[in-house]
């Protein structure tokens, strides 16, 4: 009887045979023939642009690798030459350097691993941290969502800035342009919006294009100190980096934000700023010999920014309902909104917040021009309670600005106009908001309701800032007192009666602030201290400047208290005597010069003092007068007038002129 083979051994043999068969099949499918690879050559290179020949099948925006490891992307495709924008310093790239295709377009790493990191537009870390995992990448150029894939913008993106949330509401999925002259607070307003998202579920991406490294560092430090950096990504292409990196920076930032939007989350992109990006695009276009157009910009500059900003959208519920909001920043020259790039961006976006340099100089922060700013989404995305409370705010403030301009030429006699001016001054004080002092929607609604009810009309405009600072804690205490124990959470914004009750309670807070201000004024303290450390809310530099000025004033007061009245009077007498003697000496010198210019005038003998008719010598008279405590006429002038002179009448005229000058 033949023995039966063991079952496990048979299974192992079958498995081994199958594995061997699969390997043989794989080897049979491998092409062992040599693979040809196209290699191009650099014809010339200058200013970060390399012109390459021999790569006819290159795709637009395809990554090319130079001999030595330098990378670039194809920017323009001509019949004979390809314009390649270098992404690294061009050291080592020379004529006849070999160039190879990679077959891949520009991509950037995307995913949760970027949160809290500072990277360049290619995803390379700039914060000294570990390299990023490139398991998931996205191309920097992506198509904008189609119309059928979009939904209406209906949710507010709270910025915490009262004038923006009340008058120019930004919705999730909206593109709102922040535009203004240099140093008017554009970046500060955008950073305040980022900082306020620390209480929301919004992922923030800040893109810096052509900015100074020190300015970018201040932005990052501000977000890390006041915001939620663990939900922020910083894409930095400073002014010192290659123009190619500056050009792809906003596209890379949008791709990073789209990763979260496509997964049903909400993202916010701040591009700082598109004016510098347009200048970089013009530079690259001129270097690649594209035909220039208006203001030397190429003809596709509008299309470049349009295809970038169209990627911001609110997706439909079928695609997850995520949103991507955009706050692009643009800079104007002397407030010229009709320039080429500003008009392009205004026509592309869904509204603009215009910052005025005159308002900024008048210490109104943020310096929003109410007449030129607009949000084309507006009330559709505004909270119903905030929309109801801010209904007449813009109209009242616009009328106040017009009345204020007219009242500069004369006084007001009409009581109604005076009431409008009073209301407008309170509105201006209310919308002047320090940095990093974000307000909740509940705070904004209660403030506006109290303003509409006239609770702020009786208070000084200087006390509006303390009211705004102390209101959140006051409302929290009120809500805690009105909420029963173990009660479920309550939506106070949906209860109009509760909001009215909270607005009425603001009057009690106003009385307390006024009483504190009066008590502090009696004690010689500034009224602004009633709100606590308000001076520090305007930024470190301004707070330090205020502290220095206060120290100087305090030192002056200390010196004034240390000097007694008797010492002050003695110092005054000494100073007046010194000034008088100096004036006497000047008058005598003038008289001597005039006498010296007279014809036939003899030079007086300066060795010995000249005797006076009835008195001591001139030196003794001078000594007696110098010891006196009050100024007297100079003895030298008297001696000159009484001494005999061969000129007679001429001498008398000269002496009379010197006496008149001395008396003056």
Curated annotation (Swiss-Prot):
Site (Required for activity): 373
EC nos: 7.1.2.2
Organism for this UniProt entry: Burkholderia pseudomallei (strain 1710b)
HAMAP family (UniProt xref): ATP_synth_alpha_bact
Reactions performed catalytically: ATP + H2O + 4 H(+)(in) = ADP + phosphate + 5 H(+)(out)
Bias kind Basic and acidic residues: ranges: 543-588, 621-639
The family this protein is said to belong to: Belongs to the ATPase alpha/beta chains family.
Function of the protein: Produces ATP from ADP in the presence of a proton gradient across the membrane. The alpha chain is a regulatory subunit.
UniProt keyword Glycoprotein, yes or no: no
Biased composition regions of type Low complexity, renumbered to the chain: 589-599
Positions bound to ATP: 180-187
GO CC terms in record: plasma membrane; proton-transporting ATP synthase complex
Protein name, UniProt field: ATP synthase subunit alpha 2
